[in-house]
């Protein structure tokens, strides 16, 4: 299980780095990568608690149920995750709607904050 947790956490770090690298040239990609940074970070954290999911909606539900409602994470981080998910859907599937530079910048900041809050929740030695 630690290998899976480590893999997911490293994907989170790579996604955050990709978001930062593409911000100025492609805000849509940056917004999408920021969401995936948070998604993989949450997936790693939930796996550390013995939970695995295959759907984005299941990860979101578990985040709110098992990490937010339990008090392990602040409620504002749940709202931030929802913001990232909504923006990713706009960036990836919005047609003429796009993520702005400002919203993509905000997404990166929120993803970074989520990952910072998640890291202490990971099992010892997992990353």
Name each region found by the language model.
Residues 1-127:
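Terminal alpha-helical segments
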């Amino acid at each position: 299980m630690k290998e899976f947790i480590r893999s997911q956490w490293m994907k989170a770090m790579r996604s955050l780095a990709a978001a930062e690298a593409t911000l100025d040239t492609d805000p849509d990609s940056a917004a999408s990568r920021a969401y995936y940074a948070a998604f993989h970070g949450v997936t790693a954290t939930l796996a550390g608690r013995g939970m695995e999911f295959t759907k984005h909606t299941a990860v979101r539900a578990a985040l709110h149920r098992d990490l937010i409602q339990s008090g392990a994470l602040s409620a504002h981080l749940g709202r931030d995750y929802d913001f990232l998910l909504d923006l990713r859907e706009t960036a990836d599937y919005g047609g003429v709607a796009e993520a702005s530079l400002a919203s993509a910048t905000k997404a990166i900041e929120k993803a970074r904050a989520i990952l910072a809050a998640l890291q202490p929740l990971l099992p010892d030695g997992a990353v």
